[in-house]
Amino acid sequence: MATETFLYTSESVNEGHPDKLCDQISDAVLDACLEQDPDSKVACETCTKTNMVMVFGEITTKANVDYEKIVRNTCRNIGFVSDDVGLDADNCKVLVNIEQQSPDIAQGVHGHLTKRPEEIGAGDQGHMFGYATDETPELMPLTHVLATKLGAKLTEVRKNGTCPWLRPDGKTQVTIEYFNDKGAMVPIRVHTVLISTQHDETVTNDEIAADLKQHVIKPVIPEKYLDEKTIFHLNPSGRFVIGGPHGDAGLTGRKIIIDTYGGWGAHGGGAFSGKDPTKVDRSGAYIVRQAAKSIVANGLARRCIVQVSYAIGVPEPLSVFVDSYGTGKIPDKEILNIVKETFDFRPGMISINLDLKRGGNNRFLKTAAYGHFGRDDADFTWEVVKPLKGGKLATA
């Protein structure tokens, strides 16, 4: 019987991409603030262009933070150690323009730190989405998982010397042929793999293609998804020597789909990096990922999306929504009731239940490259599945 299939694509960028560099600097600042003062209020933006990084925003903290040192260390650790590769961590200009959080916002959200956790209001209005699908062990879309892992592997083989010609900047993209199984997504095969990576002057395009196939694609993409029809575009522009902030300007919060679900589900538009957990752009998105993942892991649906929305200064969410795309074992209305009974969507309680005030150990820096979801790391507390009533993980 002929089955109707369709193509779907997700992209990723690795840690040397200028936008991702900015995300990582913003989250490194957040980590430093929270490590010394868990009640820090942080809204840290970063931008970069040739030979310059600027950190700006609103931060209220008791922490003693050396912003310039954080910027230089983060750039250096990524591999930006000379003008040749796109930025020189030790010699670039670092500009800092940080002010305190607006007292108007402070009184409305946390009462200048006088409110109890359950009273803390959302730091802003907005709506956030969580998504999960049973197509991978991570309960994430395979297009996104493979694009992200290719980017991480590019960085790994650059840093361990396997491919010494690699430079920090790079992008990946994966197209997969899917079958729609009554609302659930079933990957059939990888249709197209695209990698564009920064490189030095010494390497030929043929060498680039051979190394990428052998050391990046082969270890990442399971053989069962590749066939003789799979298309490979490996550095299709023909030259990518100039990269990093020298090639393109970078800005925090410009890779929000890469940070989440690769175009699947939905996105409320709010970025994550550089924001403390009173910012529901981040904490709200984390709790609805935990809810969506728990729904699928408990077998209540094969695929689902969860939305939550907030008003500034108000603790209780304005709305919670669940859609199982027709894959639910029980009606969506019942799943929604179980979600509302199980998860506390008030921002102050999200912070406690997901331990989001804990910085240090590169806790949030780790989230700022290669995705915030589907990661196997104890610091990613929102990836912990909760047993749900009527689900297969619920105790009798």
Curated annotation (Swiss-Prot):
A GO molecular-function descriptor: ATP binding
UniProt GO cellular component terms: cytoplasm
Location(s), subcellular: Cytoplasm
Gene3D superfamilies for the chain: 3.30.300.10
InterPro entries documented for this protein: ADOMET_SYNTHASE_CS, S-AdoMet_synt_C, S-AdoMet_synt_central, S-AdoMet_synt_N, S-AdoMet_synthetase, S-AdoMet_synthetase_sfam
Cofactor note as given: Binds 2 divalent ions per subunit. The metal ions interact primarily with the substrate. Can utilize magnesium, manganese or cobalt (in vitro).
Binding annotation for ATP: H17, D169, G170, K171, S237, G238, R239, F240, D248, R254, K255, A271, K275, K279
Superkingdom to which the source organism belongs: Eukaryota
Keywords: ATP-binding, Cobalt, Cytoplasm, Magnesium, Metal-binding, Nucleotide-binding, One-carbon metabolism, Potassium, Transferase
CDD domains: S-AdoMet_synt
Main location: cytoplasm
Residues that, per the record, bind L-methionine: E58, Q101, D248, K279
GO biological process, one term: one-carbon metabolic process
Pathway connected to this protein: Amino-acid biosynthesis; S-adenosyl-L-methionine biosynthesis; S-adenosyl-L-methionine from L-methionine: step 1/1
Chain sites annotated for binding Mg(2+): E11
UniProt record similarity statement: Belongs to the AdoMet synthase family.
Function noted in UniProt: Catalyzes the formation of S-adenosylmethionine from methionine and ATP. The reaction comprises two steps that are both catalyzed by the same enzyme: formation of S-adenosylmethionine (AdoMet) and triphosphate, and subsequent hydrolysis of the triphosphate.
Name the UniProt record assigns to this protein: S-adenosylmethionine synthase
Source organism (scientific name): Medicago sativa subsp. falcata
Gene: SAMS
